[in-house]
């Protein structure tokens, strides 16, 4: 069991080290990496490709989707045994 004084000292040290680390990172010049430069373009082109592929699939290759059986299914007569 830690004494309250030691526990407070350790927690304040952790907080100070976190704050110092954040201050160091905020002063560093951030050079753009791949995601900063091309991230939105890659995301937009990937989305456009997926949408175009699904639109083509849904409309052009002749899949019979069978969304509703109304008008296609007729009930059969009961067979009495």
Curated annotation (Swiss-Prot):
Sequence ranges on the Mitochondrial intermembrane membrane side: 61-81
Topology, Mitochondrial matrix side: 26-33
Subcellular location: Mitochondrion inner membrane
Pathway: Energy metabolism; oxidative phosphorylation
UniProt keyword terms in alphabetical order: Membrane, Mitochondrion, Mitochondrion inner membrane, Transit peptide, Transmembrane, Transmembrane helix
Transit peptide: 1-25
GO cellular component, one term: mitochondrion
GO biological process: mitochondrial electron transport, cytochrome c to oxygen; spermatogenesis
Annotated disulfide bonds: none
Residues that span the membrane, as ranges: 34-60
Topology class, membrane: Single-pass membrane protein
InterPro entries in UniProt: Cyt_c_oxidase_suVIIB, Cyt_c_oxidase_suVIIB_dom_sf
Purpose: Component of the cytochrome c oxidase, the last enzyme in the mitochondrial electron transport chain which drives oxidative phosphorylation. The respiratory chain contains 3 multisubunit complexes succinate dehydrogenase (complex II, CII), ubiquinol-cytochrome c oxidoreductase (cytochrome b-c1 complex, complex III, CIII) and cytochrome c oxidase (complex IV, CIV), that cooperate to transfer electrons derived from NADH and succinate to molecular oxygen, creating an electrochemical gradient over the inner membrane that drives transmembrane transport and the ATP synthase.
Protein family (similarity comment): Belongs to the cytochrome c oxidase VIIb family.
Subunit structure: Component of the cytochrome c oxidase (complex IV, CIV), a multisubunit enzyme composed of 14 subunits. The complex is composed of a catalytic core of 3 subunits MT-CO1, MT-CO2 and MT-CO3, encoded in the mitochondrial DNA, and 11 supernumerary subunits COX4I, COX5A, COX5B, COX6A, COX6B, COX6C, COX7A, COX7B, COX7C, COX8 and NDUFA4, which are encoded in the nuclear genome.
Protein name listed in UniProt: Cytochrome c oxidase subunit 7B2, mitochondrial
Organism: Homo sapiens
